[in-house]
């Protein structure tokens, strides 16, 4: 806790507020995350509708985000990332409140798509963070913003499970909508408007768009690796609650807590990874990501084979800790390779790639479990991490050759 306070003070009071907004709003959005299959199954008139809607309830908002993130990023560069943050929070609040009153799966899917199209909060928050911190220490900046997201996910999933054990599913969405509306009001009244990016350092402004001349690794290569790592993680998004019920017979709050352990592992490890990678060459970061992908391969393979819930929880936590060294650090390399006036656009593109990869992972997970049963979920995750290992290895070897 002391270290967290010190980091927030080091970045300044505006970042502390930004951290708090990210923590609260993303936690609110994750309150219903692990429980959508239960609600969709209750509302579906047939198994075929459930199979389609069970995918769509996660894919639709991601499609919305992937289709609009680049556009909202350009709008952020033009009109300000602070305004885009407020817009996203209002969109989340309104659609969450509407979803609470939806009583058929098709209305829910339409609203979830609209939710994604109107949202896209994370990319402008990252770009705004670069502005208010002067573009310094991006790895730690993105790591701590991701920590806020994952701490919120941990608390949100657990709180959502508690609410669902006592109240109808609509209560979860109503609570999330009110919280997002509150965050929008706080962002509008409390976050300062950066004066034309004046807070950015000259070094940040002089950064070039491509990192290839100095590292031999393109921005698109980094985005591809991030996408594959995300697809691997998202395979379990839909079947997780059903897997926990079938294999362990767990209650909703245990499912929510287990779901949040991935986020908790990330929270604990991400700042450590950020300090480890601070000032390091991209080739070092990629080399570590080769080892991280291999570690994820082992952890998920063991998690899928155990029937002891204690060991499963420990492995899920370990998996999250390994993931702390992936997306934030790779994203910081992308940001550092981008001119200051294009931060919104490029981070919006990164968000589009991440959401697209998440969609692929979700569809792959649902297709595999529908075809082969829930037992196929973890082997698929393990296989995708094997592929991630090979991609990271290729990028690392290319970076080493470039240095020579």
Curated annotation (Swiss-Prot):
Cellular localisation: Cell inner membrane
Major site of localization recorded for this protein: membrane
Keyword Cell inner membrane: yes
Membrane topology type: Multi-pass membrane protein
Disulfide bond annotation, renumbered to this chain: none
Transmembrane annotation, as ranges: 11-31, 49-69, 89-109, 151-171, 178-198, 211-231, 253-273, 284-304, 311-331, 346-366, 377-397
Gene Ontology annotations for the cellular component aspect, listed alphabetically: plasma membrane
Domain of life the protein comes from: Bacteria
rRNA-binding in keyword set: no
UniProt KW keywords: Cell inner membrane, Cell membrane, Membrane, Plasmid, Transmembrane, Transmembrane helix, Transport
GO molecular function: transmembrane transporter activity
Pfam families, per the entry: MFS_1
Family label: Belongs to the major facilitator superfamily.
PANTHER family: MULTIDRUG RESISTANCE PROTEIN MDTG
Name of the featured protein: Uncharacterized MFS-type transporter y4xM
């Amino acid at each position: 806790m002391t270290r967290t306070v010190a980091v927030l003070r080091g970045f300044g009071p505006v970042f502390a507020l930004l951290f708090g907004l990210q923590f609260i709003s993303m936690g609110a959005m994750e309150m219903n995350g692990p429980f959508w299959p239960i609600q969709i199954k209750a509302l579906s008139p047939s198994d075929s509708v459930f199979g389609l809607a069970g995918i769509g309830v996660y894919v639709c908002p991601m499609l919305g985000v992937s289709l609009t993130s680049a556009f909202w990023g350009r709008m952020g560069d033009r009109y300000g990332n602070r305004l885009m943050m407020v817009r996203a929070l209002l969109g989340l609040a309104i659609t969450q409140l509407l979803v609470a009153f939806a009583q058929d799966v098709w209305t829910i899917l339409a609203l979830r798509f609209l939710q994604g199209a109107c949202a896209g909060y994370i990319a402008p928050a990252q770009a705004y963070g670069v502005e208010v911190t002067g573009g310094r220490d991006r790895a730690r900046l993105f790591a701590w913003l991701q920590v806020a997201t994952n701490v919120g996910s941990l608390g949100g999933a657990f709180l959502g499970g508690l609410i669902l054990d006592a109240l109808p599913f609509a209560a979860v969405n109503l609570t999330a909508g009110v919280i997002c509306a509150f965050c929008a009001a706080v962002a509008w009244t409390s976050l300062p408007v950066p004066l034309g990016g004046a807070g950015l350092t000259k070094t940040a402004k002089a950064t070039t768009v491509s990192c290839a001349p100095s590292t031999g690794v393109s921005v698109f290569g980094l985005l591809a690796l991030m996408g594959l790592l995300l697809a691997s993680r998202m395979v379990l998004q839909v079947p997780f609650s059903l897997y926990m019920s079938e294999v362990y017979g767990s209650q909703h709050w245990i499912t929510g807590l287990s779901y949040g352990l991935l986020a908790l592992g990330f929270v604990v490890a991400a700042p450590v990874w950020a300090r480890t990678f601070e000032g390091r060459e991209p080739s070092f970061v990629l080399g570590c990501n080769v080892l991280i992908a291999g570690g994820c391969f082992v952890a998920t393979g063991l998690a899928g084979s155990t029937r002891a819930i204690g060991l499963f929880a420990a492995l899920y936590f370990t998996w999250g800790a390994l993931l702390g060294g992936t997306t934030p650090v790779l994203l910081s390399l992308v940001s550092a390779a981008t001119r200051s006036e294009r931060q919104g656009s490029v981070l919006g593109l990164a968000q589009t790639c991440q959401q697209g990869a998440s969609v692929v992972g979700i569809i792959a997970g649902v297709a595999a479990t529908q075809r082969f049963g829930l037992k196929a979920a973890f082997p698929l995750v393990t296989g995708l991490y094997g592929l991630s290992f090979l991609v990271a290895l290729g990028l690392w070897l290319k970076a080493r050759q470039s240095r020579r």
